[in-house]
């Protein structure tokens, strides 16, 4: 279910681009000439501003828009102080065994996990099926490509124009990474909770999440990694080879072939 959302801008100089974006996403366009708290026709707006493309909730008490941002805030803090290859996500994909892995992040969302993997030297291909999220992600990658510290990292991130189900089986990846939408109950920061609330409200749960595992297993050369909240069932009721447990969630790892057999 996708709650009502339209593309909007307050900038006359961006109106033409915003209309084209709305058309490409099959969404209404709104030229915004009033504060978000007074907008009632749409639950959310995909705002095109000089800062980029962000999603904003409308109505009374509307918070600031959410953007894909790889250059500041929590994402940048993790890049600089996140623990490197000692992080659970690094161990889950196998970076403790081999470097420079090719990874397909088939449920990219805001691209945070993909960015972490790219920071650690992986070549990451990203899939995002929801049009407005993909537009935000593309915008965030574009803006980051001009940042002196981050440009080299995002150069290792490639946003695909297709979903995982449309990828040719001959296009293999060392690792396929899945993080399907699920009703998380973790103790995230207020900012992270706001972002996730947006996407759960707008996009809803991934109803076909179980079917993604089969596609992932066909495309992965060495392993499939599934990120799950604590207490969540196995994807497609398929027991993993092993698990890595964290404070608020876990990684289910499906090993197809040992990474030790990957030629250097």
UniProtKB/Swiss-Prot annotation:
It is found in: Cytoplasm. It comes from the Bacteria. Its EC number is 2.1.1.242. Keywords: Cytoplasm, Methyltransferase, rRNA processing, S-adenosyl-L-methionine, Transferase. It is an enzyme of class 2 (transferase). InterPro entries: 16SrRNA_methylTrfase_J, SAM-dependent_MTases_sf. It comes from Marinomonas sp. (strain MWYL1). It catalyses: guanosine(1516) in 16S rRNA + S-adenosyl-L-methionine = N(2)-methylguanosine(1516) in 16S rRNA + S-adenosyl-L-homocysteine + H(+). PANTHER family: RIBOSOMAL RNA SMALL SUBUNIT METHYLTRANSFERASE J. One of its GO terms (cellular component) is cytoplasm. One of its GO terms (molecular function) is rRNA (guanine-N2-)-methyltransferase activity. S-adenosyl-L-methionine binds at residues 112-113, 128-129, 179. Specifically methylates the guanosine in position 1516 of 16S rRNA. Belongs to the methyltransferase superfamily. RsmJ family. This is Ribosomal RNA small subunit methyltransferase J.
């Amino acid at each position: 279910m996708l709650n009502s959302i339209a593309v909007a801008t307050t900038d006359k100089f961006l109106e033409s681009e915003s209309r084209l974006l709305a058309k490409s996403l099959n969404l209404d366009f709104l030229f915004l000439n009033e504060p978000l708290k007074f907008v009632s026709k749409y639950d959310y707006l995909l705002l095109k501003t000089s800062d980029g493309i962000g999603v904003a909730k409308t109505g009374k008490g509307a918070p600031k828009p959410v953007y894909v941002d790889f250059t500041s805030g929590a994402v940048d803090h993790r890049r600089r102080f996140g623990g490197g290859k000692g992080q659970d996500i690094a161990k889950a994909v196998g970076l403790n065994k081999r470097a420079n892995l090719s990874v397909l992040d088939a449920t990219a969302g805001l691209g945070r996990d993909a960015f972490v993997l790219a920071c650690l030297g992986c070549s990451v291909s990203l899939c995002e099926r929801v049009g407005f999220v993909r537009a935000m992600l593309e915008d965030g990658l574009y803006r980051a490509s001009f940042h002196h510290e981050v440009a080299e990292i995002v150069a290792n991130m490639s946003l695909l124009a297709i979903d995982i189900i449309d990828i040719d089986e001959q296009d293999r990846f060392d690792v396929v990474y899945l993080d399907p939408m699920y009703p998380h109950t973790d103790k995230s920061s207020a900012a992270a909770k706001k972002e996730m609330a947006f996407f759960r409200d707008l996009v809803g749960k991934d109803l076909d999440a179980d079917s993604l595992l089969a596609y992932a297993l066909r495309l992965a050369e060495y392993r499939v990694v599934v990120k799950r909240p604590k207490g969540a069932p196995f994807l497609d009721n398929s027991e993993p080879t092993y698990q890595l447990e964290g404070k608020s969630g876990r990684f289910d790892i499906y090993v197809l072939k040992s990474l030790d057999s990957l030629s250097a």
